[in-house]
Curated annotation (Swiss-Prot):
It is found in: Virion. Residues 393-466, 681-701, 843-891, 975-998 form a coiled coil. Structural protein, a component of a tail fiber. Keywords: Coiled coil, Virion. The keyword Coiled coil applies. One of its GO terms (cellular component) is virus tail, fiber. This is Tail fiber protein.
């Protein structure tokens, strides 16, 4: 019976149903996520989940309003509704813990923020890991709160209440609770330093340096709104500390105009002041008490002052004495009325009075105007008078200073001339001094003329100096010989005359001033002002000329010098309108002055357009232009002065005016002294004004001081770092800098999205990897994205452009060209930093390596524990055996103990051997000890029932020996295991760090095409198919070439087999893909030689394959990234990608960086996890030969581009199925079908059972074996054959683990580039992919994709099984092992480490390298050096002609028509010493003008002479050979090359003589490129070694910055030479079947149009047989850019090897080779020099000796076994200057300054002048006198 249910009502329907709508939106767990964007406006962040890579990001339009909120310690609204809380800084990349409000995934909230362990450790304040919580001594450290802000300033509060708060510039406030005796906080001396604070350091000891080095500007303001009575609070208390340290405390009232203040300044001044103005140092009624910078105490009240000095009390600048007479003062002031009035911001003091002069009444009217706001300190009448008096003291000081400068200059010149030589650098210093003298000379002459001082002697000394110096400075590039004594004397005479002139001027001036003050009142108002300006102008001119002389001495303007010059120009611009106004007031013509100003403006303004670049400038013109301006200004102001003085002329006065220098006091007051002389008496009305302006009171500094300040400013500029240019949001196009619009793309140009910027902030944009011309366009926009301004800059190579954002700028956009090959970085700051992608372009994705680390660490710990246990066991066993054998008897019961012990030994023995083999430790001694013990115990244990007699000591020693050897073995294993574990941990850290940079997920394995064909991941199996085509690898791309030109072909990533592909997307590792999502395929595609190709993506919809295609790519498109997409439906069961020819014209296409991803937006290419695991498994590959394109550097470049994802732009995106939709049933090509049947590529079968009916070549991976065993079917007779390790390397993802042994063993030998950590996984090709640091300890908290579980299991199994099977023996290294003598040699052979090539960088020129292809033994063989040693009786019948176009570097010898029967030219001396039996070959180019001559005739002869200076004619020779030609049988009107080989019969001297016997006035013959070489084979012409410096050389050496950046500094270069070669023979220490050698080098090829047969690189010869060639062998293939590394590993069969650097057909190329490393072992090691070699640009030390070179003079000193000599270049030739020859020192020239002594005589130099005669010569005297 059915159970009855209770009654159901309509209202209850559905109550049992659970609502699942949007259940997928719910998340009930906490997640770890990474911040990918900070939304500062709302204090929220956007996140990327670390586990499933899900992004939590709201719409951009919301500006982060609904993104994840950040936690606060407190926050809310206060009682009146105002918000309060806190905002903490957070950075992109920070790891946070995330929860979800109401479990809604759209409402994330950040619960907490976590730093990685590295950062946390650095911030830790303690060095101990834990402690007793009750330990009072550590309470301060344990309970410390420490906050370090991004500005690197901090706030630290320790557990005892001590607190330190720091600010910029290392300023800080410290509160210390320790007892004073124990506290480091003190103001003693300079007080506690920032570095003395314990809190100022990271945990690792590095100092925490604030980001800003400048001291802070501090202001404390104390004020209120209302006081206690409810009235407005008017007090204003300010405490201000300026960045320069000036301290000021002020009190004011907001409704009153007064201020009281206390101030201390950095120069030691202190003052307490009350004034009637709120302005700093303002007011008229002033009371002040202070200490000035000289330490004098002063008191001031109004116009009265007192000053306490060392010698007494002063008032108004005068010393109080007991008998001071003030009557004169009263008399002068008697009758004087004073009127003070204030008008329009200035104070006028008008004094009217009368005085009696010479019995006549003289009226006096004086007006002093002080401009308000310009001069803050008031100057009284007395002060002005005192200043005028003191100006004479200042002038005396100035003269004293001039004397000191002269003394310094004389010392510098004495140092320069001490060796009677002036080098170029010394000439520059001399030029600076001479420029100063030239600039000051007219100024001093003018002053002398003004003051009527005789300047004849000064002029004479100047002229003498000019006459002496000018010829010396005519040639600034070479070293000149000078008479040092004359040079010193001439300069000294000038300086002495100058000081004498200045003293005369000073005396005349002082006398004139004193007289003038007695006879006259004040100078004319405007005349005085104009004269002040004129004097100031002169000083400014002198100072400016000196400054400009310093700046422009080298004809360059650096940025710092531009800032100095700009400062000078700004002063001129400011003074210009004032000067014009003065002139216009008196109607003075300003045309000349204006013209000079405009000329200066026109010259200097362009120099200031780019203040950050060094500019080339005409130094003389710069100096002249400034000098002209100042001269015209002085002339103008003097003219104004003259006009103003006409007022005095009206009274019949003849006034002469005398000017002084304007001096500057410590108070920065500029003074003027004048002399006014009244010529005639009479009633006079004089009027004078002294106007003191702040602009004219400015402290002057020297050029060096200015430069130092500017340099400091540059060093403190803001640095950027974060790239703001986001690649993934860029679009194709080109910005318009005039209106901010985006136009059509040009030359792969792109435009950034709107970049948020700060106003008035420096930014810098930099291009990286740019070749040729490019441009950077930057436009600025306001908050509404309305265009503000823009700028475009063009340049070549890598370059930068600096900006300051406009005041209202909120956004910027940046545009540039060649985005397919060039990177850009746009960052805040003023200095460019290394390129890095933006954070938006780098999304972290981590792969767990923890299991691997644990396994290796466990093995290391186990090995260490085994060693410890073995030691203890051995001690116990030895003690037991000692007890048993002490009576030399072994009873049956003792034998049982011995047997038990022996069984334990037999059990452990194979285990220990296995461990030793696994870790590559020699077990020979251990095995010997074991066998000895075995042999010893066998007879003893044969009978266990009787007592045996034994020798106790032998028994003990045999056991002891075994245990000792076991302990030694296990200790070695422990050491090696620990080393491997440490390296593995280091490796894991590196890989984990690098994996942070990987973005989304790529479902294509081996997708980069780096010598592995791309495969789609289906059931963890890779598939690819090829139809009618073949593949090869070119760079990082797969090149697919069709078998027939009329048949389309393709490359398929995946399989079209529906049985395999139709299992659903889960088989593609796409478990999370849902219906309605998009699959996006993208790849880089390039078409070669015509036709078009495209990318297609196909989905298996039921039983049909349905596809969508990208836009076809043509040859003209170059390398493009294309995209094709398919939408997932409910029928989708499979997917594949195809790169296919789009028509029948395609011969070849290339592709790379294939990517299949989920989503509708294509993202930058990234490696799949399979690629990364492949990198891990195969990081060190035993590669025998690297071809030209397989090199590390190019791998680095391409990998970097892959990670950035911006190498190519996306084109032809098919955003829906309708684009190029082709719905059809898939039909396999015949070759596809055949390939699946016969087991060609693509036929890999993974199964635990063998396939039935296998075809030949089929690969079966036996899954029943652990590890999996791959096998190939050979035939029915042979059956299945296991693959070799080399073949297994191509197995997808390395399931068998066979090359793991190679990985670990070779890792110890691996030496990669300096920028790569030398670890187990230190492959350059792998580690360069990644940039940022990961935190391996966080992996405990992370999970991987569920669909990676199977890979993880395989990986763990691989590690476990692989390590157990490792055979380390062939890879023993010498890193951490205690080697025995018999195994040490083999270890060194494997590890290598010694470069067997000498002079492998070229620092020693071409030493140790033999010649070039068939060394040319004939100097000047194509007359590029002129005739040189060529000559003879008929030399007048020859001339040298310029090169022709076919050989543009080879000159031509031409004969001149004459009736002479024989014309020939040879060398004297004859160039080549030859010996009997030697064979030589002569070759040369020859042509002639048309000639009717039908007989053979000689065109060149070779003769052998008995002596090198024998006359060249035939009758004087020993033997000779002639090269014959006949114009009737051979066309000789075109260039032809002739050769002749001959053998020397008699030893002698060989010469080559071009010859003609044609008697004609018109006929001419021509020769070029003569060559004589050893042997019977004529080779390509090359110049003789002596010709290299003049012809460009066949192979020369070069030192460039690029080579220095590689760590080499020097290299060999062949520049545009048809053929060149250098060889070096290397004798190998030994050879063997298993002994390998490695060769590596770096090469850079620069060429625009290589010829077809161009080749270059290095060849390896064994004996005379060429065995290997490494480099560029096919110029039709792309030639890599920049320096590329090439590697070769080979097994030689001969100990005699030869390394040859070669270039063939290189007339259009420049080739540089450097860093050649030839070492023992199969790992190409990092470059190092040959043993005992030391090379740099100045010193070389090798087996030849020591050479020290002077690069300025091209001279050098050599110390070798043969000589100790010095060489120098004399007249273009290197000559020996001195040498030690036995007991004799030979010198070319000798200079002695005082005497020469050779016992018993001394020779003294005499240069004596007496009253009657002058003695010059040598004096020979006894040496003892």
């Amino acid at each position: 019976m059915n159970k009855l249910v209770k009654r159901r009502f309509q209202a209850g329907l559905g109550s049992e149903i659970k609502r699942v709508y949007k259940e997928g939106q719910q998340i009930n767990t906490l997640l770890l996520a990474q911040v990918i964007q900070v939304n500062y406006k709302y204090n929220t962040v956007d996140l990327l989940a670390l586990q499933h890579k899900e992004v939590f990001q709201n719409s951009y339009a919301n500006e982060g309003r609904f993104s994840a909120r950040l936690p606060m310690e407190f926050g809310g609204r206060n009682i009146v509704g105002q918000p309060y809380g806190q905002v903490n800084p957070i950075a992109v990349g920070t790891v946070v813990l995330v929860g979800f409000i109401n479990s809604d995934k759209d409402m994330p909230i950040v619960i907490s923020v976590y730093n990685n362990n590295d950062v946390s450790k650095q911030l830790s304040r303690t060095q101990f890991s834990n402690s007793d919580p009750k330990d009072l001594e550590l309470i301060g450290d344990m309970h410390q709160k420490f906050s370090l802000y991004p500005s690197l300033t901090y706030d630290s509060v320790d557990g005892e209440g001590g607190r330190v708060v720091t600010f910029s510039g290392k300023s800080f406030i410290a509160f210390d609770t320790k007892e004073v005796a124990n506290s480091s906080t003190t103001d003693a001396g300079y007080g506690t330093k920032y570095e003395d604070l314990e809190t100022s350091y990271y945990n690792n000891g590095d100092l925490i340096e604030p980001m800003k080095g400048r001291a802070p500007n501090v202001l404390f303001k104390h004020q209120g709104v209302l006081d206690d009575d409810g009235k407005p609070d008017l007090h204003d208390l300010l405490i201000h500390i300026n960045p320069d340290g000036t301290y000021r405390t002020s009190m004011m009232n907001k409704e009153e105009d007064w201020r009281t203040l206390f101030e201390m300044t950095p120069d030691g001044r202190v003052k307490l002041r009350k004034q009637d103005s709120i302005n700093i140092d303002g007011g008229i009624e002033i009371s002040e008490l202070g200490i000035n910078n000289e330490g004098f105490v002063y008191l001031r009240n109004g116009d009265m002052d007192l000053e306490v000095r060392k010698d007494g009390i002063y008032s108004q600048g005068k010393l109080f004495t007991a008998d001071v007479d003030l009557s004169d003062v009263y008399d002068k002031l008697n009758g004087l009325s004073i009127q003070i009035k204030e008008t329009n911001g200035q104070l006028e003091i008008i004094a009217n009075g009368v005085e009696e002069q010479n019995g006549k009444i003289s009226e006096l009217s004086t007006e002093i105007t002080i401009v308000a706001g310009k001069v803050e300190s008031k100057v009284t009448k007395t002060e002005v008078q005192d200043m005028i008096d003191s100006s004479f003291v200042d002038m005396s000081d100035a003269i004293k200073k001039a004397q000191e400068d002269a003394d310094k200059a004389n010392k510098v010149i004495a140092d320069m001339s001490s060796d009677n030589r002036l080098t170029p650098s010394e000439k520059i210093d001399l030029l600076k001094e001479w420029d100063i003298i030239k600039n000051e000379y007219p100024s001093y002459l003018e002053q002398a003329e003004t003051y009527e001082v005789d300047s004849k002697d000064y002029t004479a000394k100047y002229n003498s100096l000019e006459l002496f110096v000018t010829p010396i400075l005519a040639d600034m590039e070479s070293t000149s010989s000078v008479d040092g004594a004359t040079l010193r004397k001439t300069f000294n005479s000038y300086y002495t005359a100058r000081i004498a002139l200045l003293n005369s001027i000073s005396k005349k001036l002082k006398d004139g001033i004193t007289e003038a003050m007695k006879k006259a009142s004040q100078a004319s108002l405007d005349a005085t002002q104009a004269m002040a300006d004129a004097s100031q102008a002169k000083i400014d001119a002198d100072n400016a000329n000196k400054l400009i002389s310093d700046i422009a001495s080298d004809n360059k303007l650096t940025p710092s010098e531009k800032y100095q010059l700009k400062k000078e120009w700004d002063v001129i611009v400011k003074e210009y309108p004032t000067t014009i106004a003065q002139a216009e007031k008196y109607a003075v013509d300003t045309a000349e002055y204006t013209a000079k100003y405009k000329a200066l403006e026109l010259f200097v303004e362009p120099l200031f357009k780019d203040m950050d670049e060094t500019s080339i400038v005409d130094g003389e013109r710069l100096r002249a232009t400034f000098s002209d301006y100042y001269a015209s200004k002085i002339a103008l102001l003097k003219e104004v002065t003259d006009s103003a003085k006409t007022e005095l002329d009206a009274y019949g006065n003849k006034i002469s005016v005398m000017e002084t220098n304007i001096t500057q006091t410590s108070e920065a007051i500029t003074l003027l002294a004048t002399r006014v002389q009244t010529v005639e008496d009479g009633v006079q009305s004089n009027k004078a004004q002294i106007e003191i302006q702040a602009e004219q009171i400015s402290q002057k500094v020297t050029a060096s001081e200015v430069k130092g300040i500017v340099d400091d400013s540059i060093n403190n500029l803001t640095l950027g770092g974060t790239n703001l240019f986001v690649i993934k949001t860029q679009t194709a196009g080109l910005l318009n800098e005039n209106d901010g619009t985006v136009g059509t793309a040009v030359d792969n140009s792109v435009v950034s999205d709107y970049i948020k910027v700060n106003q008035k902030t420096p930014y810098i944009a930099t291009l990286y990897g740019n070749t040729g011309t490019n441009m950077i366009i930057t436009d600025w926009y306001d908050k509404n994205r309305t265009f503000i301004s823009g700028e475009a800059v063009a340049d070549s190579g890598d370059f930068s452009k600096k900006y300051v954002s406009p005041e209202n700028a909120v956004y910027a956009r940046v545009s540039y060209k060649k985005a397919n090959s060039v990177n850009i970085k746009f960052e805040a700051g003023t200095k460019a930093t290394d390129y890095s992608p933006s954070w938006e372009d780098i999304k972290g994705d981590q792969t767990a390596l923890e299991e691997y680390i644990k396994k290796v660490e466990e093995q290391a710990k186990k090995a260490q524990q085994d060693a410890e246990n073995a030691k203890n066991d051995a001690e116990n066993a030895n003690n037991a055996i000692a007890d048993m054998s002490n009576d030399n008897m072994l009873a049956p019961n003792e034998k049982k103990q011995i047997l038990l012990q022996w069984e334990q030994i037999k059990t452990e023995y194979p285990i220990n051997l296995d461990q030793a083999t696994k870790f590559g430790v020699s077990s020979q001694q251990y095995t010997t000890a074991y066998n000895a013990l075995d042999e010893y115990l066998k007879p003893i244990l044969a009978d266990m029932t009787t007592t045996s007699v034994v020798v106790g000591s032998t028994l003990r020693n045999t056991f002891n020996n075994y245990y000792d050897k076991r302990t030694t073995l296990l200790n070695r294993i422990s050491d090696v295991a620990k080393n491997v574990a440490d390296k593995a941990q280091e490796t894991a850290d590196t890989i984990n760090d690098n994996l942070q940079n990987i973005g989304g997920y790529n479902y294509v394995g081996f997708s980069s095409g780096d010598n592995m064909l791309p495969r789609l991941m289906i059931k963890n199996v890779g598939y690819y198919t090829l139809g009618s085509s073949t593949t090869e690898f070119i760079d990082s791309m797969v090149a697919v070439k069709g078998d027939a030109t009329t048949q389309p072909f393709d490359y398929t990533v995946g399989t079209s087999d529906k049985e395999i592909a139709g299992g659903g997307l889960a088989d593609y590792r796409m478990k999370e893909v849902k219906e309605g999502q998009w699959l996006t395929a993208s790849a880089n595609v390039q078409v070669i030689d015509g036709g078009s190709a495209r990318l297609a993506i196909y989905t298996l919809e039921g039983d049909n394959w349905v596809g969508s295609n990208s836009t076809p790519i043509q040859v003209s498109d170059g390398l493009k990234r294309v995209v094709a997409q398919r939408k997932v439906t409910g029928l989708t069961k499979g997917v594949l990608i195809r790169i296919e020819s789009a028509d029948t014209n395609v011969k070849e296409f290339r592709f790379g960086n294939v990517q299949l991803e989920v989503g509708i937006i294509p993202t930058p290419w990234k490696k799949s996890d399979i690629d990364i695991q492949e990198d891990i498994n195969n990081v060190v590959q035993n590669i025998k030969t690297y071809t030209a394109w397989a090199n590390d550097l190019q791998g680095l470049d391409f990998t970097r581009e892959k990670v950035e994802g911006k190498t190519y732009m996306y084109v032809g995106t098919s955003m829906k199925d309708s684009d190029n939709y082709s719905d059809y049933t898939w039909r396999l090509t015949d070759e596809h079908i055949e390939g699946q049947i016969n087991g060609k590529e693509g036929a890999w079968i993974y199964s635990p059972t063998a396939p039935t009916n296998p075809s030949q070549g089929l690969i079966w991976v036996d899954l029943s074996k652990v590890p999996n065993q791959p096998k190939r079917w050979v035939d029915s007779e042979t059956g299945w054959v296991a693959l070799t390790p080399e073949e297994v390397k191509d197995l997808p993802w390395g399931e068998d683990g066979t090359n793991l042994a190679d990985w670990v063993a070779q890792a110890e030998q691996r030496i990669s580039s300096d920028s790569i950590i030398n670890t187990v996984l230190g492959s350059e090709d792998f580690t360069s992919v990644f940039d940022t640091k990961a935190n391996t300890t966080d992996l405990d908290n992370l999970a991987t994709y569920e669909d990676l579980d199977s890979i993880k299991e395989d990986y763990n199994r691989l590690i476990k099984e692989g390590i157990n099977g490792i055979d380390f023996t062939p890879y023993v290294t010498n890193s951490e092992l205690q080697q025995l003598k018999d195994s040490f040699n083999f270890s060194v052979q494997q590890a290598g480490g010694v470069n067997m090539l000498k002079n492998s960088l070229g620092f020693s020129g071409l030493d140790f390298w033999d010649g070039t292809v068939g060394k040319n033994l004939l100097p000047n063989s194509t007359w590029n050096l002129g005739f040189g040693r060529w000559g003879g009786a008929s030399i007048a019948s020859f001339e040298i002609l310029p090169p022709e176009d076919d050989k543009p570097t080879s000159h031509i010898l031409g004969s001149i028509g004459s009736r002479s029967s024989t014309k020939e030219i040879g060398n004297r001396p004859h160039p080549l010493k030859v010996n009997s039996g030697e064979t030589y070959t002569i070759s040369f180019d020859y042509k002639e003008e048309a000639l009717a001559y039908d007989k053979d005739r000689p065109i060149l002869v070779v003769r052998n002479y008995p002596d090198k200076d024998t006359d060249q004619w035939m009758e004087y020779s020993i033997e000779g050979w002639a090269v014959m030609a006949n114009g009737s049988t051979t066309d000789l009107t075109v260039w032809r090359r002739f050769t002749k080989t001959f053998t020397i019969g008699t030893s002698g001297y060989l010469d080559i003589l071009p010859k003609t016997i044609v008697e004609s006035w018109t006929h001419r013959s021509f020769w070029r490129e003569l060559k004589i070489e050893e042997g019977s084979q004529a080779t390509t012409w090359v110049p003789n070694k002596e010709d290299g410096a003049f012809t460009g050389g066949i192979v020369e050496t070069t030192q460039t910055e690029e080579l220095a950046n590689l760590g080499f500094g020097s290299g060999f270069v062949s520049s545009k030479r048809p053929s060149s070669s250098l060889t070096q023979s290397v004798e190998l220490p030994e050879i063997g079947a298993n002994l390998e050698y490695s060769l590596s080098f770096y090469m850079k090829v620069t060429t625009d149009n290589p010829v077809a047969d161009f080749k270059c690189g290095i060849r390896v010869y064994e004996g005379d047989t060429l065995t290997y060639t490494l480099g560029i062998e096919d110029a039709t293939q792309p030639i890599p850019l920049g320096f590329q590394q090439y590697k070769l590993v080979f097994t030689p069969t001969s100990t005699s090897t030869k390394i040859e650097m070669f270039v063939e057909n290189g007339q259009e190329a420049s080739v540089i080779i450097s860093g050649i490393m030839y070492n023992i072992g199969n790992i190409p090691l990092k470059w190092q020099p040959y043993p005992s070699e030391i090379y740099n640009t100045n010193v070389k030390i090798d087996i030849n000796g020591v050479t020290v070179k002077n690069n300025q003079t091209d001279g050098y000193t050599m110390i070798t076994p043969q000589e100790f000599s010095g060489y120098s270049r004399i007249d273009g030739n290197i000559e020996r200057i001195f040498t030690l020859n036995g007991q004799v020192t030979e010198v070319k020239m000798l200079k002695a300054e005082k005497r020469i002594t050779m016992e018993p005589v001394s020779v003294f130099a005499m240069n004596t002048v007496t009253d009657t005669k002058r003695i010059r010569g040598w004096a020979f005297v006894p040496s003892f006198e």
